[in-house]
Amino acid sequence: MAFAAINLSATKKIPAIEDAFAAEPSLKKRVYDAIGTTPQYIPLFEDIAKYTSSLLVRNASAPVQPVETPTDGPAAKKRKLQNGDTAGQAQSPGDLKADAPLQFYMQDISFALPQRKKLTLEITAGRGFLRARNQTSKAVEFGIHVDKIQHVLCLPVPEKNQKQFNFCIIPQYGDGINSPPEGETAPEAMVWTVNDGPPRAAFSGNGQQMGSNDGQTAENVVRQMLNENLSQTKVVRPDEREFVSAMPEAHRKGEKAYHVKAFRGSKEGYLFFLSTGILFGFKKPLVFFAFENIDSISYTSVLQRTLNLNIVARPTSSDETQELEFSMIDQADFAGIDAYIKKHGLQDASLAEARRAKRYNINGAKTGEEGAMDADGPVEEESELQKAQRELDDEEDEDEEDYDPGSDDSNDGSGSSSEEDSDEDGDEDEEPFQGGMVCGFQPPGSAPLPYKKIHARAVWWVTYVSGGAFQCFGWLFNCICRLLLCISPSAIHYALTVSPKTPRFVVTRICILRR
């Protein structure tokens, strides 16, 4: 013991060990403890220290990470860092954290996942990593290879006075639905926030500031850089043609909201209904339901003010399903949510296989705007309305071509069918109508009468009455005609008709017919 104490005091400060482990006091203490117990290994520890110093000099720009010890910090914090190191199992932490030329970096970015802190966002040029670097220690905290990114979302942050955007990076096996292969750790999603405005600290790899042009915002710059580096996906943003909330942003008046507030258990979050799937965020665990992973969607606990949304999800490589319930959704958003679900056929479990086979994806050659313009719902609805209007116009043209005012009365060659002409001819004896026509009253919105069977030569007056408030005119017209029939049963026949294929409550055609 005395010999060990003498040797320990003699080797308390070895220059090589002091230089090599100056930044690691706990590791340096363990080395000296080992030397005190086994002083014969002093030359070995000196050689290790010298080699470590040479590595530090060689990789001066890449900081050495602390060795994990029981005194370094809470176990939960270590797990967070380990899970966030990389999303791909093919890359080691050394690949992610190695010194590499940068294509883009942006300082003072507020990250929410997997760590809540301000970091520098980096995109490497050669290896293609998206990573976050500590601005004080210069250590890479976490990151992911761009080839392992499955979904990228850019979403407005709800309920903020200042407009901000959250970028959500969802790696493979990191969507909360699909589990990684056995023995591998599930990667965590990355979420960071940028303000709506010009970027203050965005630079290219050579240090040139980016976004100095007029109209360039931080959101535009980051989205552009991501799209340039992503090969399997593109940045997806909300689209009002997919879903927009019935309630505007509470903190930013006049701005549309694309989210729905909901609870998963006791955890509050927001649902976003996007062109590639449904996101629930922005707290852990973030969940993204891609269309191909949705088995079916249903409603439960539908009350006067709220409802619950149940999503049955099926992983891509498994037949086992899991059901997640999102509660306390405002009833005001039911119509928009239901239209979105029906548009993509998400309410029908029998279509799940077709969705998986089709694998909904706007991330090909088309941009998000182009993909939204090609969506079936709005375009199809517009074309149907145009088609109905065209058919009405065609039928009106046919009636005008067939109409011959002189065929009823050879003495009347004016060719007029106006109300004024009908008044002038009212005193004359009229020939009975020979068309074999069946006339009657059709209330607005009821089943169409066979308008084409009404002979145009018997029509005095034809007009169109829009739906809505004008339908009251149809009922008033009915009453007047019934009164006239009571006074003079031989005066007129009448009909309210709509063209076949015309949407009900859209157009009502009114005809006053000669007997």
UniProtKB/Swiss-Prot annotation:
Pfam family of the protein (one): Rttp106-like_middle
Domain of life: Eukaryota
Bias (Acidic residues) ranges: 371-383, 392-411, 418-432
InterPro entries (UniProt xref): PH-like_dom_sf, RTT106/SPT16-like_middle_dom, RTT106/SSRP1_HistChap/FACT
Ranges for region Disordered: 62-95, 362-439
Sections of the chain in a coiled coil: none
Biased composition (Polar residues): 83-92
Disulfides per UniProt: none
Keyword Electron transport recorded: no
Keywords: Chaperone, Chromosome, DNA-binding, Nucleus, Transcription, Transcription regulation
GO CC terms in record: chromosome; nucleus
Location of the protein in the cell: Nucleus; Chromosome
GO molecular function (one): histone binding
Keyword Transcription regulation among record annotations: yes
Function, as annotated: Histones H3 and H4 chaperone involved in the nucleosome formation and heterochromatin silencing. Required for the deposition of H3K56ac-carrying H3-H4 complex onto newly-replicated DNA. Plays a role in the transcriptional regulation of the cell-cycle dependent histone genes by creating a repressive structure at the core histone gene promoter.
Similarity annotation: Belongs to the RTT106 family.
Subunit structure: Interacts with histones H3 and H4.
Name of the protein in question: Histone chaperone rtt106
Classification lineage: Eukaryota, Fungi, Dikarya, Ascomycota, Pezizomycotina
